[in-house]
Amino acid sequence: MIVYHGSVQGVEKPDILHSYRPLDFGKGFYVTTVKEQAERWAKRKADIYEKDTGIVSIYEMKEDMQEFAVKIFKEDLDEWIDFVCDCRDGRPVYEQYDVIFGKVANDKVFRVVDMYHSGIWDKERAINEIKIYKTYDQIAFITQRAIDCLLKMESFYEV
């Protein structure tokens, strides 16, 4: 399966050491199956780092993950929101997995997490506020072993 990573440089040898902050699924190396989404990520990072262009790295991802601890979030947001909130709060709930698959929340997720954790909103309200990009996905590689065994860089291009 082909997956993509958006950044400001080609990432030939991904590693978890460069994951400096907890995202939806914790600290890890994030890819997507959606080319346009990776291009958007690359352009956003280029803007943040004041670069002229972003770079999308393309990888072949092995689909046989039987020897790895894999978490897949389907359409049910109930478990997903608690997991994302825990990860965004810096809790290491993600560390029990090697690879995590799921949807991508919109940019309001930080506000929703704050409202939910402060008790201002209950879970139902928080779930209703988080809008999921139906066609976007994210795959987080949590362990270096998973990256080394499952991802192989094919190429990269500028956006």
Locations of regions flagged by a protein language model:
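Glycine-rich loop/turn
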Residues: 1-29, 37-47
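Conserved NAD+-utilizing ADP-ribose enzyme module
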Residues: 23-24, 40, 44-159
